[in-house]
């Protein structure tokens, strides 16, 4: 199984070509689809939906998003949660492409379905879930405290756990595993990772795919914190279980 990917070496593909010019690269695992995508400036993503849940983090640019009538302008480090089958759309604002990291569960593919006019007009009810999060306003929590100093913020959906985390310079993540699948993309810093004996030093825009129950560990390389976006399926939580050597 391939554990490591470089976005720069992956095929740039269209995602949602029936309703948007969204393009980028992604990895399809057993339970998660995870990738780095962008929507060109001056374009929009028409109302659409898909049976799978989706969570995204803005990397750059500004976008006006609407989820079931709940609208918000999103900028860097904002998170957008789209429940399964929620009708949503987006319009890129300004003269910069909208770049984002996204995760979906594999109950459906990367492509959505164009909404009918009736579906596009649908509004969420009073019990609608929270669709938008700003990392600067979220609690910084520990993740994996029994084996690493990993910390950050994350959103837990019905099927996906998704967040932005970091591991301090000069520290390690000791060997651990978890029953859920995990995907990681590096934002900054460098990290030497070992997944079931397969080792690689990761830098910005590298993706790691950690299968369920795979034993993995790592060490931050250099004097910069290792910052990454990660997704896990919800068959287990954010915390893993240490593995004794």
Please place each PLM-identified region on the residue numbering.
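A short, N-terminal "cap"/entry segment at the start of jelly-roll beta-barrel domains
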Residues: 1-31, 110-159, 243-245
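Ligand-binding loop in jelly-roll beta-barrel domains
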Residues: 84-109, 212-238
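Short acidic-glycine-tyrosine-enriched beta hairpin
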Residues: 69-84, 198-212
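Conserved GNAT-family N-acetyltransferase fold
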Residues: 37, 56, 80, 165, ...
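Histidine-centered metal-chelating micro-motifs
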Residues: 44-45, 64, 80, 84-89, ...
């Amino acid at each position: 199984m391939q554990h490591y990917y470089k976005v720069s070496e992956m095929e740039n593909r269209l995602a949602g070509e029936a309703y948007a010019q969204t393009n980028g690269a992604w990895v399809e695992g057993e339970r998660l689809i995870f990738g780095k995508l962008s929507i060109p400036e001056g374009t929009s993503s028409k109302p659409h939906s898909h049976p799978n849940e989706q969570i995204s983090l803005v990397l750059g640019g500004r976008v006006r998003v609407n989820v079931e009538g709940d609208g918000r302008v999103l900028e860097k480090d904002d998170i957008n949660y789209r429940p399964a089958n929620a009708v949503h759309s987006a319009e890129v604002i300004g003269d910069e492409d909208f770049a984002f990291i996204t995760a979906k569960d594999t109950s459906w593919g990367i492509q959505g379905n164009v909404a009918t006019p009736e579906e596009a007009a649908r509004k969420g009810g009073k019990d609608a879930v929270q669709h938008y999060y700003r990392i600067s306003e979220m609690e910084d929590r520990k993740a994996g405290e029994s084996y690493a100093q990993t910390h950050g913020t994350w959103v837990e959906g019905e099927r996906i756990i998704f967040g932005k985390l970091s591991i301090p310079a000069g520290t390690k993540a000791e060997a651990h595993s978890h029953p859920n699948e995990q995907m990681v993309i590096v934002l900054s810093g460098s990290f030497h990772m070992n997944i079931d004996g397969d080792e690689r030093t990761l830098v910005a825009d590298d993706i790691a795919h950690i299968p369920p129950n795979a034993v993995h560990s790592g060490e931050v390389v250099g004097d910069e914190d290792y910052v990454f976006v990660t997704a896990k399926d919800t068959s287990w939580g954010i915390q893993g279980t240490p593995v004794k050597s």
